[in-house]
């Protein structure tokens, strides 16, 4: 790889790191190519990607981005996973993959520029996705007006039932 290729790669990585909401550093030593392809496909489905490059190039690319807090973890065989939208999906994919593959070890992560540990990444993976949370919020908002309408319609309904009972009572007295 010549100097121009390295500069182009650093530029691409810098752009990726700058747009990333979630960045994860993992050790992939000993994984088969087919296993890397598997996680690459799974990550692509949730607007994320996994990149492998030399650690010095990763450090240069991380400068000035939210991923810079992870620069100390760029040692050994390093893969960097970047997510550009909802961080929950990639966190789920990575924790499930790491659970099934001993040789894939998550070192650390950065969520919007703040370094988080593996335990917080696993907690993030347990959250429902953004779409599910929005659905739950919408359901809650929908239930409030519905309940209010039921309460408000209960008063006239009770009044009408009372009038009907009074009418029935008068009719029975008249017989």
UniProtKB/Swiss-Prot annotation:
Key word Lipoprotein present: no
Example GO biological process: translation
MF (Gene Ontology): large ribosomal subunit rRNA binding
InterPro entries (alphabetical): Ribosomal_uL10, Ribosomal_uL10-like_sf, Ribosomal_uL10_bac, Ribosomal_uL10_bac_type
GO CC term, one of those recorded: ribosome
UniProt entry keywords in alphabetical sequence: Ribonucleoprotein, Ribosomal protein, RNA-binding, rRNA-binding
Pfam families: Ribosomal_L10
Statement: the UniProt record of this protein carries the keyword Isomerase: no
Family membership: Belongs to the universal ribosomal protein uL10 family.
Quaternary structure and interacting proteins, as annotated: Part of the ribosomal stalk of the 50S ribosomal subunit. The N-terminus interacts with L11 and the large rRNA to form the base of the stalk. The C-terminus forms an elongated spine to which L12 dimers bind in a sequential fashion forming a multimeric L10(L12)X complex.
NCBIfam families: PRK00099.1-1
Function of the molecule: Forms part of the ribosomal stalk, playing a central role in the interaction of the ribosome with GTP-bound translation factors.
Name listed for the protein in its UniProt record: Large ribosomal subunit protein uL10
Source species of the chain: Desulfotalea psychrophila (strain LSv54 / DSM 12343)
């Amino acid at each position: 790889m010549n100097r121009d290729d390295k500069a182009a790669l650093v530029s691409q990585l810098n752009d990726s790191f700058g747009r990333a909401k979630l960045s994860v550093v993992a050790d992939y030593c000993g994984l088969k190519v087919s296993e890397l392809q598997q996680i690459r496909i799974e990550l692509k489905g949730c607007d994320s990607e996994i990149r492998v490059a030399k650690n010095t190039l990763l450090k240069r690319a991380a400068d000035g981005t939210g991923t810079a807090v992870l620069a100390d973890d760029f040692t050994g065989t390093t893969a960097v996973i970047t997510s550009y939208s909802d961080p929950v999906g990639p966190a789920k994919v990575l924790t499930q993959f790491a659970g099934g593959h001993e040789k894939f070890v998550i070192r650390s992560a950065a969520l919007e520029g703040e370094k988080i540990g593996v335990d917080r990444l696993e907690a993030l993976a347990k959250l429902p996705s953004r779409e599910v949370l929005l659905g739950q919020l919408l359901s809650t908002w929908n239930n409030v007006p519905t309940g209010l309408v039921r309460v408000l319609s209960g008063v006239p309904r009770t009044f009408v039932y009372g009038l009907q009972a009074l009418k029935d009572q008068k009719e029975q007295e008249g017989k």
